[in-house]
Amino acid sequence: FYESIKPRETEHFSDKENHLVDTFDFATYSIYNYKMRMTFRSLYSILDKVAFFLNEYFEIGIKEYDVNYKSIWYIAKKKANGEIIYKYNNPIKEKINSNWGLYGIYWIYKDFIEGKKTSPNPKITEISKIRNSLEHKYLKTILTIGEVRILKEKQKSFDDKLAFYISIEELYDIVLFLLKTIRSLIINLI
């Protein structure tokens, strides 16, 4: 994160002599931009790492390929139609009231999962969109000069259904928010 925001006296060698076509969408590309994206991805992956730890520590019994930050709070693996694939013994719900750290982790989970629809914090919704774009589509960071025009017109004028547009400043704010949230998660885990 620091490397993506620290003041730079010279251009990075990987950014020199790169000739890009201007598509008038004010997109910006640089190694520092991608370091910010990698910071986001690394921070978001810590959620699932915490889930793996909790699955082992509390001996929940979720199969390795089914463990994620959502599944550790339930008692069964279900199909999309609601049919139960397998059940597991999940002692976490019983231990939440006596373990303040676990209680904090649970409420961070609630922010992320339920926050997509009902959270008063709009950053949670943006985090979900950014993560989905980084993993399955692509993210275009744009310069502030084009921010107002581009962010209002996003997908309409460019007809680019795979891209998610965000300004560099917004991405910075969201990564900083995620950094603070993951810090809280780790402190609660310890």
Annotate the PLM regions:
Residues 3, 7-10, 14, 41, ...:
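Generic structural signal for well-ordered, non-membrane alpha-helices
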